[in-house]
Amino acid sequence: GYPEEATYFLKRSQGWKQLFDPEKKLIFPKDRQGNWKHRNPLSGDGWVEANAWQATWSVSHGIPDLIELMGGKDVLCDKLNYAFEQAADDDFVYGYSGGYISYANQPGVSNAHVFSWAGKPWLTQYWVRRVRAQAYGAVTPDRGYGGHDEDQGQMGGISALMAIGLFSLTGNVDQNPSYEITSPIFDRIEITLDDRYYEKGKFVIQTYHNSAGNCY
């Protein structure tokens, strides 16, 4: 192994905690001297195509730590739920660095799945359904790819994962990787598996009493 490198990168992976503002309970950028650049959660200054509302939840390797810093699961879920409520009327689609939640660009497309890691999977299921329908639900500019930043197929990828009800917040890089189950829109889904790695040929997702109103 490489113990020195492991120690170095483990420390680096915790650096986001120094950017957490305990008063606003969000992450903000700092300058080289360690001072806040600003504390406007909707400003993109200091961010790459994001803002504090969109990017705070992106520490997918450290959600338990984020929960602790925020003051508990309920606090995190209430704050994130508020962000989704603010973005719903605009179909969760904004330009770069704009809005509370944006599914038109890469930085925030995992946000709906954070609820599951904070003990409220029903909120993940609810908002996954809403986002998929409103941001990816058709091929029109209003209900489809209206200004979406399609880099390397990521927006199409998150749309497909929402539709089949599977997602991995950590990108399947854990020692024991797993998928979260959300809310598939189809009654039956068959995924053909690579026989070089799996004994069985298909992975089947079967839903019962599936409807727009019965998403849990």
Residue map of PLM features:
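Active-site core of glycosidic bond-cleaving carbohydrate-active enzymes
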Residues: 1-204
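C-terminal beta-sandwich/jelly-roll accessory domains of carbohydrate-active enzymes
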Residues: 198, 209-216
